[in-house]
C-alpha cells in the first residue's frame, strides 16, 4: 500500500501473505512436476510484473496500464537513462525476490501434501484475511479511492476486462448517446460561457507561434538562464498560477493534446490515439484554419513518435513537419538546437510564411531529460554555455540550466527572424510547458528550487502570451492547460463557448486546476488525499465549498472522458 504508514502499513503485507498462502496451497494440489513448473512460471511472472510496476512508479509516480505499452517504442529512446532513476535497494530487492523463488523450488518437499492439509491452509488463510479486513481502520474513504486505481486487479485483470473486452461486447451506440447527453448537461452548467470581456478580440487577425516548452519548470526561467523568455513573460501576459496536470500516460503528449483541443487525455486506460478518427473541429488549429490561417506542427523527431504524424493532422494541423526530413544525418549536431527550424531555410519558410496568416505549433526538445554529460544534447549545451557548470550544488540542475539556455536561443532567434520578415508587429508568441521537472532524479532539489508548500504545487509551470503591442499583465488566477483554448479563442475574437476549460479573463470563472486522481487546486486551497493539505495565506475554504468543488471535480473528470468516447464535437 503506497500511502500507508505506521501500523496500517502492515495490513497490506498481511493481505499479500494470505494470498501467497492460498496460491501455494492450490498449486500443491497438482502433481509434483506440474506444481514445480507452474509455481516457477507464476513466480517469475509475479516478480517481473512487480519489478516493472515498482520501477514505473519510481519514475512516473503512477502504475502502468497495459495500454501504456503502446508508448514502449517512444520511451526506448530514453532507455539509457532508466537505471539512473532506480536505487541500489531496488536491485537488491529484485535479486532477493529471484533468490526466494530459487529457494522455493529447491526446498519444495518431495512428498505431495494431503488434500485435507491443503484445505486447512486455505481455510486458515481465508480466516486470516477476514481478520485483516476486520482490523482495517474505519476511515477508509481515501484508501478505497486508492484501491480503485492501484493493485494487481486494477492494473491487470480490470485493465484487460475494461479496456479490451467490454468495448467489444457492449452497445457502444447507446453508451455514446448517454455520454453526449451528460457532456451537454455538464457544459451547460460548468463549461466555458463564451461571454465577451475587455480582452475579447484584442489579438484578432495576428499570426500565432505556439511553443510547447518541453520540460521547462517555473524556477528555471531567470534573467540569467533564459533572458529572452524572461523578457517575453514580463512584457506580455504572464500566468503565474498555470498548472499542467497529468492525465493518461504520457505527460508531454497529454499537455500537447490539451493545449490544442481543450481536452485532456483519457483517464480510463485508453490510449489517446484510439480517438484519432474523432471530430476535432473545435481545436485551435481547426478553428484558425476555418478563419483562413494555415496550421502546421514542427518538431525534430520522427512522425511515429507519440504517433504525431497521425494525431497532429487529426487535431486539425495541415501536416506534422519533422526536422529529420531536412537533414541527411538524423544524429547531426545541428538537430541539437531547437533553432534548427529557423536556421534551415526551407523549414524557416514553412514556419514563417509571409503570404498568408499562420497558426504554427513548435514542439521544443532542448530542455528534455536527461540532465548530465551522458546525454548528447546536455553535453553540447554545457560545452556551449560552460558558465552553468557550477551554478548549483546539484549537477543535474547545472545541465538543466544549460539546456534551458538553448531553448532561450530559439526564442531570441525567432524574434530576429520575425523582425527581418516584417512579421514581428503582427505575430503572437505563446509559450506553454508540458510538465515540471519530474524526470530529475534529485526531486528534493526540485522541491527546494520550486519553493513550494505542498507537493501538488510542483505542477505549476510557465505560461505566457506575448505580442509587440501588448500591455504587460500578470494573471494570478489559478488556471490549467484546458483553459488555454477558450482563452486564445476569446483573444482572437472567436466564439469560446462549449469547452471543458474556461476563458481565463472571464470574471465569472473563479479558476481551478483539477487532477486525474481527484485532487484540485483553487485560489484558496490545495485538496489532495481526501482533505485540504494546504490553505493559501489569507484564504479560507468552507466545507460547503470543498463539497461543491469535489462534486465539480467528479463531473469534470467524467466529462473529459465522455467528450472523447462520444466524439462529442462531431456535427
What is each PLM-predicted segment?
Residues 1-162:
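Transmembrane and membrane-interface helices of multi-pass
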Residues 2, 11, 61-64, 128-170, ...:
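Proteins with a high burden of low-complexity, intrinsically disordered sequence enriched in S/T/G/P/A and R
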Residues 11-18, 73-76, 80, 92-96, ...:
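Generic detector of well-ordered alpha-helical segments enriched in charged/polar residues
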Residues 66-72, 140, 146-159, 163, ...:
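Low-complexity, intrinsically disordered regions enriched in charged/polar residues
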Residues 78, 132-210:
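Membrane-interface segments at or immediately adjacent to transmembrane helices
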Residues 185-571:
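Solvent-exposed soluble domains appended to multi-pass membrane proteins
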